[in-house]
Amino acid sequence: MNEEIQTLLIYQICDSLRFQANMEDISVDDVMDVMQENIMVECLLDGVIMDKADVQKIVIQYVTDGELGEEAIGDKMESMYSNSRKKLLKEIDDLDNTISTNRKKDKLLNLYRDTVLNRLQNKKTVLDKLYHGMKEDSSVIRNRIYLERIKNETPNSIAELQLMLQRSIADCIMSEPIGSEKYNIAKEIQINLEDTIRFMKRALE
């Protein structure tokens, strides 16, 4: 909770004590008692603990030369409320813009992912079939990459997607004997991936 809202809250408590409880002299202890006993105030504070010194500073602001300036206090409270409202609305707008930007970014990343995978799948050598055919206990694969996850999850970046696909192809190449049919297929897929990445870079420029 920011200082303006804390100040507003204590001003409201002071007003309540003064006009509803008919208390001419308001002490810091009176304000502290309300803060500790009032469920609404407790919810507004939301776990924020204000010590006596903090409350005293705000109560002193409320009191002008030992007397309560009713009109001035009302104007100050209205000004603080207006400023807090503007700040809150700006925070909401900023959050909406961030969410909108993130959604657009996710859509672009998913589009890039789908385009790259579709171009690889449209070739006669299909990466996922080759990868699924590898032995589970292959000693050259430390952390097996599951291509279904690549297809269904939004990558954090284009670079991450390219890295995952590159690792998948490298796993295929490293797990097969040089010159074997699967080795040659994996090498061809490597060329296809490089061509696809170049194609996508040109498309995005």
Swiss-Prot record:
Keywords: Chromatin regulator, DNA damage, DNA repair, Nucleus, Transcription, Transcription regulation. It comes from the Eukaryota. GO terms for cellular component: cytosol; NuA4 histone acetyltransferase complex; nucleosome disassembly/reassembly complex. Its main location: nucleus. The keyword Transcription regulation applies. It is found in: Nucleus. GO terms for biological process: DNA repair; DNA replication-dependent chromatin assembly; nucleosome disassembly; positive regulation of transcription elongation by RNA polymerase II. The keyword Nucleus applies. InterPro entries: EAF5. Component of the NuA4 histone acetyltransferase complex. Component of the NuA4 histone acetyltransferase complex which is involved in transcriptional activation of selected genes principally by acetylation of nucleosomal histone H4 and H2A. The NuA4 complex is also involved in DNA repair. Belongs to the EAF5 family. This is Chromatin modification-related protein EAF5.
